[in-house]
Design a protein with these regions (language model features):
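Outer-membrane beta-barrel translocator/receptor signature
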Residues: 1-37, 45-49, 102
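Acidic/polar loop-and-plug regions of large Gram-negative outer-membrane beta-barrel proteins
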Residues: 21-25, 38-44, 48-111, 115, ...
Length: 235
């Protein structure tokens, strides 16, 4: 993160913020990667006018672990008295969940005199996500998994020992445009000072979603080292 003036008078200045991070998550085989940069440019021709261009770009090739585990084997021990290892990952070995964000806009204000000041803020943002994941959905004996063919194939005595899993294939794009314009008025009536803020704003948002879900193979909690299938085997 660094900033500086581009001229001796301070009329033009900039700021550049960046981030790069890569780490292994707690769950086995899960990674987190994030890269971001946020350039900004400011123009101040005088002490009454300020214009700042803002932008932000972020890419996350891997967002980390996506899933959840039941109380069996975590909060409560399994029937064999053991618990799942803390790095247990019930997902497929090739789960993917990526995200990409970008934003551009500006902030402008100008003071006409001691009474009137105008401000305007404009933003355009876009967020894209892509996910192909298998995740836990409670033990097979849970009534919520009554429609799972994989759980139904198990013997009743085994259903409490197997983790039901679902899969999700999801591609989303969210776009947002907003602009607001404000007029600030300062005046007095007798001994009372007033500040009146008036304005108008506009926002448009669109979200495109292409997704589907379903049940995947269940996992035996008594043998958590059994490798889950690759994503795509059953989809």
């Amino acid at each position: 993160d660094f900033s500086d003036s581009l001229d001796d008078d301070g009329v033009y200045s900039y700021r550049l913020t960046g981030l790069a991070r890569s780490a292994n998550a707690q769950q086995k085989g899960s990674e987190e990667q994030r890269y971001a940069i946020a350039p900004a440019f400011t123009w101040r021709p005088d002490d009454k006018t300020n214009f700042t261009f803002l932008s932000y770009f972020q890419n996350e090739p891997e967002t980390g672990y996506y899933g959840w585990l039941p109380k069996e084997g975590t909060v409560e021990p399994l029937p064999n008295g053991k618990r799942l290892p803390t790095d247990f990952n019930e997902g497929a070995k090739n789960n993917t969940y990526s995200r990409n964000e970008k934003m551009v806009g500006y902030s402008f204000d100008h003071e006409f005199n001691d009474t009137f000041t105008v401000r305007q803020n404009l933003r355009f943002a876009e967020n894209k996500t892509s996910q192909n994941s298998v995740y836990g959905y409670g033990v097979c004996s849970d009534p919520a998994n009554a429609y799972s063919k994989q759980c139904a194939a198990l013997a009743p005595a085994d259903k409490g020992h197997y983790l039901a899993r679902k899969y999700v294939v999801d591609d989303e794009k969210l776009q947002n445009f907003s602009v607001d314009t404000q007029l600030q008025s300062k005046f007095a009536t007798g001994d009372i000072d007033h500040t009146l803020l008036t304005g108008v704003d506009f926002m448009r948002m669109r979200n495109d979603i292409n997704a589907w879900f379903g049940y995947d193979d269940s996992v035996p909690l008594l043998n958590p080292d059994e490798s889950p299938n690759d994503f795509g085997k059953n989809h």
